[in-house]
């Protein structure tokens, strides 16, 4: 469920641009791509039309995504949220009981400061933190050197400080960007590639925590 209402990217990254149909119960039927049920504001707007809404409209949309979509039986409902502690986060927490939040950061302090605010917000609304993921941890240069553009270990250190699991690093891979642009995620295109394994390891850790 894509709750980045102002900047939805799920349609592009999952390679699907259709509009959802309406069921006999007057609920939207989520679209499916690569075996995943999806709902996004990007399915409801033409092209690159912007969403220019105040908070109450955003809140109602998120409520509709939860209550007026025929999700059926799910293993896990994964919600993509924008950065920060704004209306999207608060609306979601007020609409549905959450098993927990996964915090995504980059290694540098500028990002970690925002992360601490996010953790504090979830704590205030009684949503447990399932773990921290460090994105864009490093890239491997053509000569094989590991280059840490944004510093090293910030996510792991913050997880230790917060007393929450560190779920892993996602390095910078060209394949991740290419998969997102083409609508074929790297975990679908080549399941045994290093970038796919980075995501698979993260998913397995999260599944062990939840199930």
Regions flagged by a language model, labelled:
Residues 1, 78-79, 133:
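Hydrophobic residues in beta-strands of the RecA-like P-loop NTPase core, especially within AAA+ ATPase
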Residues 1-48, 53, 59, 66:
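Phosphate-binding loop that captures ATP/GTP phosphates
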Residues 40, 103-106, 132-133:
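Conserved beta-strand segments of the P-loop GTPase G domain that flank and frequently precede/overlap
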Residues 72-79, 85-86, 97-118:
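Conserved Switch II/interswitch segment of TRAFAC-class P-loop GTPases
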Residues 119-211:
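C-terminal lobe/tail of nucleotide-utilizing enzymes
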